[in-house]
């Protein structure tokens, strides 16, 4: 006779199962388990008197015979493709199984073999997501990497050379010399990295040189002059060399209006940064570009979500980042032209509709590198409160909304930048870049961050204590982030042209270099759960935003979850 236990007791022991629901942190977002891949009665769990013991849940299978290096037991996976309970097997730094772990000699339905060489990570009672991907990094200081990792980000892409004036304003690593130095600096940083060259040139030679030197993309920024000529030249080089182009358009409309930029793009794939416009771009209507099928639109997190403080903090941020002088009226007018409550409010709704596809940070250049995931789910919460359930959801859960928003910081930036074969989702064959969260701290404080199959960051107590848990407990780097363990766990993304020129040997790099690919064929339709193409217009007098004729407006949030309740200092 099978032994029956209550649903509550089961969830407390093995984690929630099909039909169970839970709240994410202090938000109004409710998650419901769609499927459980484990087998009732044959679940695996580690510990004294538990299942993963020799001859029980642990087989005699050696690593060479198929046993995994690590098993994450009973994890609740939240990814764009589903919300499921499963065991996850890791081997050689990759995800090799999502299903039922254990001993096939004694248990039913085993798809992930646990052996004497298998380490166990307890996933029961935890949410498992793919490591976050931030594709709008100003590499101003190396301390950003630890801050990002502590928030659940495992891949950072952008540009910069340190606290140079150009880097403070623009996401570019200009020229072969600086690209080489940044690729060498990446050797000691425990995340995947990729660097954008400067895309502002009207002829191709200097752009091609940067791509051959190791740039994985090119960035067009108005502070360097984003004219129709530079847009066309940059995209032409990108099409030939298969790298992505990111663009910060012309706020002042000096070289043309948004229609002229769209014409210069000529239907080619492009990633538009801070597409609402407060971070920069054609004033007041760059936001309409999100309705173009070839445009991959993203937001940066200072406008996520729209709150009572958003407008006030932006002016000073903008003046500092873009080297403006508050004593010059024209500089102040430039800054003020970018900050519009109407377009920021509309941005919230366009994210909820799936018309904006990606959220990134704009680190130390009007954005906060450690708040990408937090701001993403604050936006989801605000939209749930203000707009109610999505049509695809029900009164029981917000599953579709949760999948839509997790896609904005995982799979969609990976697809946009040609790295989705390696990272961006919890799928077999991909790098084991994974984040475990306690549900009560989801989106604000990861419990464990796994990078390439090794733990690189975790909540940890006093190192002199007799057990791991006495306070002060806070996030700390772990063994996977040190020594020669770091290089095999991380990827450096470059161009195919750089791989052909043997950039790894030329620069003496130990990390694996990986070429981005298929960046020019991806369109908005490829972006998961965020491919809506509304016809967007902006009233030039009032700045009101309309999508398919409907006014998009919402009130600023007065209070947000994932905020001071969790961050007292």
Swiss-Prot record:
Domain of life: Bacteria
Matches recorded under InterPro entries: Amidohydro-rel (IPR006680), Metal-dep_hydrolase_composite (IPR011059), Metal_Hydrolase (IPR032466), Urease_alpha_N_dom (IPR011612), Urease_alpha_subunit (IPR050112), Urease_AS (IPR017950), Urease_asu (IPR005848), Urease_asu_c (IPR017951)
Cytoplasm as UniProt keyword: yes
Keywords, in A-Z order: Cytoplasm, Hydrolase, Metal-binding, Nickel
Catalytic activity reported: urea + 2 H2O + H(+) = hydrogencarbonate + 2 NH4(+)
Any single Pfam family the record assigns to this protein: Amidohydro_1
Keyword Metal-binding: yes
Post-translational events: Carboxylation allows a single lysine to coordinate two nickel ions.
Gene Ontology cellular component terms for the protein in this record: cytoplasm
Binding, Ni(2+) 1: 136, 138, 219, 362
Cofactor: Ni cation
PANTHER family: UREASE
Family: Belongs to the metallo-dependent hydrolases superfamily. Urease alpha subunit family.
Listed name of the protein: Urease subunit alpha
Source organism of the structure: Synechococcus sp. (strain WH7805)
